[in-house]
């Protein structure tokens, strides 16, 4: 159970962190193009 939860957490972080980073870059680029 604990190992599975840890694995799911690590996987979630691996997915969320790069995704949020790409979203931030996309928003900055979009806002720069708009202005």
From Swiss-Prot:
One of its GO terms (biological process) is photosynthesis, light reaction. One of its GO terms (cellular component) is chloroplast thylakoid membrane. Belongs to the PsbM family. The lineage of its organism: Eukaryota, Viridiplantae, Chlorophyta, core chlorophytes, Chlorophyceae. It is a single-pass membrane protein. It is found in: Plastid, Chloroplast thylakoid membrane. NCBIfam families: PS_II_psbM. Keywords: Chloroplast, Membrane, Photosynthesis, Photosystem II, Plastid, Reaction center, Thylakoid, Transmembrane, Transmembrane helix. PSII is composed of 1 copy each of membrane proteins PsbA, PsbB, PsbC, PsbD, PsbE, PsbF, PsbH, PsbI, PsbJ, PsbK, PsbL, PsbM, PsbT, PsbX, PsbY, PsbZ, Psb30/Ycf12, at least 3 peripheral proteins of the oxygen-evolving complex and a large number of cofactors. It forms dimeric complexes. This is Photosystem II reaction center protein M. The chain crosses the membrane at residues 5-25. One of the components of the core complex of photosystem II (PSII). PSII is a light-driven water:plastoquinone oxidoreductase that uses light energy to abstract electrons from H(2)O, generating O(2) and a proton gradient subsequently used for ATP formation. It consists of a core antenna complex that captures photons, and an electron transfer chain that converts photonic excitation into a charge separation. This subunit is found at the monomer-monomer interface. It comes from Tetradesmus obliquus (Green alga).
């Amino acid at each position: 159970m604990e190992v599975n939860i840890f694995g799911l957490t690590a996987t979630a972080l691996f997915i969320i962190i790069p995704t949020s980073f790409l979203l931030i870059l996309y928003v900055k680029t979009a806002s720069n193009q708009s202005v």
